[in-house]
């Protein structure tokens, strides 16, 4: 019920020390405190972490953020986080060029682009444009990865948690996904896969 209840009943104060990337944050508080005091006044920037759930989000994106924030829905908050990450516009200039380098192994094997128009995603494959909900789920998962890279949400020092990347994926694309993940890891993205 209160911050002070975190303090052991026999102790007068609690001390917490947190080390992130060789930066240390220290906190002290007593059983009567309502606010925490920090011993240091530094902000430590945590790496961006993205979780991609087993069910794809691409075809659900249009209106999902508003729906989630205003109504009871049977999706957990990780879907909202992913929708917000997908909501960012693509990078431009050198940042965009750098993002393309991260996904180049995939683009070399598969002529695909992902665009967002009027809050809907479209997948352009071999010059033909398809609405996201009209293509196979495995293709939507790949398009999600591509878009997260080109909009800068998945970048160096990011952490990616991908649950069942192989689910509903065309078997011929599994090696392409593996190459993409290896290339992302080589470029400083930490990857956790659950299958």
Label each residue range with its predicted role.
Residues 163-165:
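Walker B catalytic acidic pair
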Residues 185-186:
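Conserved ATPase "switch" residues in P-loop NTPase domains
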Residues 159-161:
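Walker B motif beta-strand of ABC-family P-loop ATPases
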Residues 194-195:
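H-loop/switch region of ABC-family ATPase nucleotide-binding domains
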